[in-house]
């Protein structure tokens, strides 16, 4: 089967200029990818631990609301930030968060510049690429379309133009046809910055976008945009924290245990409930790796 043509983000820049006001508004709310910023979190269960007694881990992520975003002070915050900060404190570590180019995450881990990466990161299908801590939450990779679109099922994506964030599971699924229910699409736009996905759909530059369902629901709520999310998911995944494949320190094992404790003692449910009205879909990880 012929693979869909893959277009990098630059190919849509001219078209996206039409939606520049929309894009600028999004960028202003999301914050900048330049430099590092530390997160200021209060009220976590492990906050009693003396900060000076904790070893520091360098943690990288890109912006992926509500899991990772910057607040009005420029601090890196979000659901994944709260979860990881709590879990690391339980095993004697504290995170130093920095925003990264998501496409460079593997080389940053391999070089030792980062200890781990996170940010709604699907471990399903990548089990042999990293050392994983998790899964700590469940998620669905889904397709979203305009409410008036004639796309109702995955089969309706045939000969359509779809946008994804580069190096994500939707990109892999659509490029390599790893889901037998997904037909041959016409073209796949791969953006290095996920903030371009939503304007591309809203402005009619693509027929559909694919991403974590949770991020799409958050965008709807925050910006008053309405999607129609297809009932059939591309993939059901477990979210994890990734360490370099050659990292032998064992932090991933300890962190996995901390995540399991947080699931068992109700901490995970409490944190997820701060961001989503119904936390139950995120806590149902039966069958996920």
Give the location of each predicted region.
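A ligand-binding cleft/hinge motif common to bilobed small-molecule-binding domains
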Residues: 107, 120-129, 173-176, 200-236
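Acidic, polar ligand-binding/catalytic clefts
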Residues: 81, 85, 94-156, 233
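Extracytoplasmic small-molecule ligand-binding "clamshell" domains
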Residues: 31, 36-120, 190, 254, ...
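Periplasmic-binding protein-like
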Residues: 61-63, 138-145, 221-260, 278-289
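Ligand-binding clefts/hinges and TM-proximal coupling segments of bilobed small-molecule sensing domains
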Residues: 31-43, 94, 169-189, 228-229, ...
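Bilobed "Venus flytrap"/periplasmic-binding protein-like clamshell domains
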Residues: 58, 62-66, 74-89, 121, ...
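Extended ligand-binding regions for polar small-molecule ligands
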Residues: 81-90, 151, 155-169, 241-280
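Short helices/loops that flank or line small-molecule/ion binding pockets
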Residues: 89-90, 98-99, 103-116, 131, ...
């Amino acid at each position: 089967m012929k693979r869909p043509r893959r277009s990098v983000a630059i190919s849509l820049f001219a078209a996206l200029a039409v939606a520049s006001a929309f894009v600028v508004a999004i960028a202003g709310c999301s914050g900048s990818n330049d430099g590092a910023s530390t997160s200021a979190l209060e009220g976590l269960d492990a906050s009693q631990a003396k900060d000076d007694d904790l070893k520091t881990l360098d943690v990288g992520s890109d912006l992926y609301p509500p899991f990772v975003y910057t607040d009005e002070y420029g601090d890196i915050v979000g659901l994944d930030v709260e979860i990881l900060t709590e879990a690391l404190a339980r095993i004697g570590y504290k995170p130093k968060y920095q925003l990264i180019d998501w496409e460079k995450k593997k080389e940053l881990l391999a070089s030792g510049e980062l200890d781990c990466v996170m940010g709604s990161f699907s471990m399903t299908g990548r089990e042999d690429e990293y050392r994983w801590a998790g899964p700590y939450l469940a998620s669905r990779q889904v397709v979203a379309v305009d409410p008036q679109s004639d796309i109702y099922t995955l089969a309706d994506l045939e000969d359509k133009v779809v946008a994804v964030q580069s190096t994500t599971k939707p990109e892999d699924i659509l490029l390599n046809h790893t889901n037998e229910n997904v037909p041959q699409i016409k073209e796949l736009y791969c953006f290095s910055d996920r903030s371009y996905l939503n304007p591309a759909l809203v402005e009619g530059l693509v027929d559909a976008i694919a991403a974590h369902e949770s991020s799409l629901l958050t965008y709807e709520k925050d910006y008053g945009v309405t999607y129609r999310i297809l009932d059939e998911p591309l993939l059901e995944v477990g979210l994890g924290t990734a360490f370099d494949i050659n990292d032998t320190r064992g932090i991933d094992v300890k962190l996995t245990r901390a995540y399991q404790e947080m699931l068992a003692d109700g901490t995970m449910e409490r944190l997820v409930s701060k961001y989503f009205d119904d936390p139950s879909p995120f806590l149902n990880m039966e069958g996920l790796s």
